[in-house]
From Swiss-Prot:
Keyword annotations of the record: Acetylation, Actin-binding, Cytoplasm, Cytoskeleton, Isopeptide bond, Phosphoprotein, Ubl conjugation
Glycyl lysine isopeptide (Lys-Gly) (interchain with G-Cter in ubiquitin) crosslink site(s): K54
Name this protein carries in UniProt: Profilin-1
Sites bearing Phosphoserine, chain numbering: S28, S57, S138
SUPFAM superfamilies: Profilin (actin-binding protein)
Summary of the function given for this chain in its UniProt record: Binds to actin and affects the structure of the cytoskeleton. At high concentrations, profilin prevents the polymerization of actin, whereas it enhances it at low concentrations. By binding to PIP2, it inhibits the formation of IP3 and DG. Inhibits androgen receptor (AR) and HTT aggregation and binding of G-actin is essential for its inhibition of AR.
Domain of life of the native organism: Eukaryota
Coarse class of the protein's main subcellular location: cytoplasm
Amino acid sequence: MAGWNAYIDSLMADGTCQDAAIVGYKDSPSVWAAVPGKTFVSITPAEVGVLVGKDRSSFFVNGLTLGGQKCSVIRDSLLQDGEFTMDLRTKSTGGAPTFNVTVTMTAKTLVLLMGKEGVHGGLINKKCYEMASHLRRSQY
């Protein structure tokens, strides 16, 4: 899906994000495009299943993983019409910095963004939401 890489380039262009991915979640979940060598390129079908699944309470207690990176859920509106967003924060290991993550949903895809250190979650959310809105208008 080489055409999807242009969307990743667009999301990464302003330098506020360190990782981005577009993941297809219908039928057989898979990463359509992602930043090479980063976390989101390794997202598994099981991780996608947790994101889009009906159980919306367990990850508030246990967190969830994206590409093996543990995350805490801050706000879950992923399945709410008009919202379609989930805000997360990476969990720290050994005092490492944590980062804001937003996941947005379209009819066929999940758009994931991870901000750089110190980048406000609201900025990441807005950028991710705008890309998802564009994809929804394009019937994705």
